[in-house]
Amino acid sequence: MSSALKELFPTVKRRPRTLHVERGERTSASFLRVLSSKDKARGIAKRLPEAFVHFGSGTIKNYEHLRRAVSYIARNGNITLEKADKSLLAGKADYDSELYKWKLSQTIPDQGGSLSHARRLILSMPAGTPEDKFKNACRKWANDTLSGYEFVLGFHTASTDQKTNQPHCHIIVSTIGKDGKRMHIDNQTRDAMREHFVACLKDFGIEATATRRWSRGKVLKGIPISEIHNERKFASSQERAKAHAIARKKERLRAKDKQIQSVISAFKEGRNIADTPGITKIKKNREKLLQLVGKAIAELEQSGNSEDLKIAAGLKDYYKTLGPVESLSQRTLRELRETQRNNQKQADHIRRMQAMKKRKNGLER
């Protein structure tokens, strides 16, 4: 296989499907299914959606935190949860009873605590993904990767939650296995678990891929999932959580106001916003990326294989459409200037039409 393609889309080392399989018991079926470099290139070429797997921090350290975290994904009992054995928890009484069993089996303290007893995971796909197929893929992924641990699933979809149109699955999983061992997921295992989710989606007819942001040429990050869901509100008492959320909001507003002022100032003065050291570094990385892409495409084309030629053509098309490397402030300034130019063109067009109308009226007289 192309060495450039491997560098562009590195493969993940195989990892055990579960975290409690002894070496002597491992077979090919005991490992997570990962993507090859060509699988990832094909996904980019076909512009398949990226499978999203978020591993939350292990901040659930006592029974109070656990109940509140599960209540959140259950929308206070309005969304039915599912257990690892596929049985349902249809309301607060059901999941409170289940969580009390966790408390007794793991000796979870009522309050306080210094060790993690559970963590949050989120699986997600773009709007329009078939809900039933998505749910089945999530169930399979959870059973494949989290067997040996207690967990509950909560599905937030357009049909169950008015607040979302993007299907996602919340998972609260115990961090203490049935054998008493504590969960540990390193970065390689996280990548392998994400790619296994792609395989599970494919099992139910949903095409997706899992690649690095750098390989895709993505620059601006979206709003962190921790900001969207404010996960830390579960890590302390209600009053402390409220104060924390307010402080974080004020901090974001101050930063946003500073960005807005810098954009307005640059727009009025007709100057550009200088690159930050981070943007300068990203531009250099973009150059390296495009050089590597060029080599990978050339190697695919040289193979003469019809499938490789399709992938090469798709990669060319994808990387041609990458947006410029710029900060959020720089992008806002560029869009403002584009809007100004478009408005000017529209105003010029209106003036020309009015002038033509006047000339026409003059001739008719």
Place the predicted regions along the sequence by residue.
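N-terminal nicking endonuclease/strand-transfer module with a His-rich metal-binding environment
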Residues: 1-365
